[in-house]
Amino acid sequence: MSNHTLSSVERTAFASSHASLCALGTYLRQIDFFAPLEARVHLKQKVCKYTPIQKVEMVFVALLAGAKAITHTSTTLRVDPALQHAFGLPGCADQSVLAETLNAATDQDVAALRTAVEELFQQHSQACRHDFAQDLLVLDSDLAPLPASRKAEGAERCYMGRCRSRTGRKLVRVRAGPYQETVWEAIRRGRTLEGLDLLKEAVTAAERVLGLAGDDDGTRAKRARTELRLDSSWGSTAALNWLLLRGYHVTTKFTSTSRVQKLVRPIQAWQPTASPGREVAAVPEPVRLAKPTVQYAVRTPSKEQAAGYHYAVLVTSRAELPMQAAVDRYDGRAALEAEIKSDKQGLGLGVLRKRKLAAQELLGLLGQLAHNVLIWARGWLTGGAPRLATFGIVRLVREVWTIPGRVTLVGTQVQRIRLSALHPRARDVCAGLRRLIPPSQTRVALA
């Protein structure tokens, strides 16, 4: 981030409610993490006190600090000079100024920020360094509702999950399952459906980010070691055939209810699964697709009918998996839905709303970057604090990066961070930060 020059080199101490987050900001500055953002994102807005990219970075830091609205920057970042210095910010703009900057974003600014976010992903993600010889890379994709006001650009009255008919937009996300990283996401109009065109857009974007695009032998071999787990809404014949011919492994469920009823009708014997009440059986006459697949019927007791069942047909190209393992593997896709929910609770996804679609997309990309930074930072800490490896987004935001303490600066550089020993996570976080940040640059200790 941009350096703030004090009038003279002096030692200054600040109390901070986010001292642990100050340590993360110090490390990100040391590795020049924000260089792609500053090089690519240039919003056309008049500069009075802060540059547009500085204001964009202020919103990003506020998200890491747990802000659920732009107004929360006044109670998280603006009142914390130590946090501002740690991330290299010269201060914090008023919340109305930050809102104006977001509203000034254009489609070109969104594209520039997306390029920078993808560049950062390629630099720091584990998914881009996946060992395909060791195991398959699993990608999950889903289309989730994002409530919005009726006057918001792109908002339409449509199916919004449990809310049924409500006004909003849709979020399409591709996730690297083993690493809990968001590979790509975008905000679309409310009535967007899980069609083949949207699937192609999402998969093509994920290929670009992960280096899976192209037709050379090496790239084809990587795609052959990549599995896509999709919601049943993407279980059409056209979508399945396109993915199979593209060279991917696929695990999903058929969309058509009439097709499912036809496939399960001849089945007589069912086997229990690990989930109580749910049963599974092999489909005797599977649907022929572009490449060989195995198909299993799954039935679950209906809550509406005393002796009734809900039926589904699971289709997978992973023929080597036993029937029970194939069903359990598809169940792992639910982690994506839980992850989106945790982003809503921890990072304000769906709560931070802008009327202008470009402004909402800019916020979405900052949220995507914040999600990935939290996941990467958890990995950086676990070398010295393995107990943090199981923490999700909500606990990372609320417990790990909200440890209070005292931050000492020499000039603009953070020299020492003392974390409050009374915090239950302070000892683990301190151990992780000590391994991450060399003592010659910044000393981290317990108060």
Locations of the language-model features?
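Basic, amphipathic alpha-helical segments enriched in Lys/Arg and hydrophobic/aromatic residues
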Residues: 350-412
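An internal, acidic/charged active-site-proximal segment
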Residues: 186-302
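Dynamic "connector" segments at or just before major functional cores
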Residues: 1-165, 171-193, 197-220, 402-447
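Short acidic (Asp/Glu) and glycine-rich catalytic loops that position anionic groups and cofactors
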Residues: 1-6, 35-39, 78-82, 306-310, ...
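Short amphipathic alpha-helical "interface-anchor" segments enriched in bulky aromatics
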Residues: 27, 73, 325-362, 366, ...
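An anionic, glycine-rich sequence signature occurring as long contiguous blocks
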Residues: 248-345, 431-447
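Short, glycine/acidic-rich hinge or "gate" loops at secondary-structure transitions
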Residues: 90-91, 215-221, 226, 381-392
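Short, conserved catalytic/metal-binding motifs centered on acidic residues
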Residues: 58-59, 73, 94-98, 135-145, ...
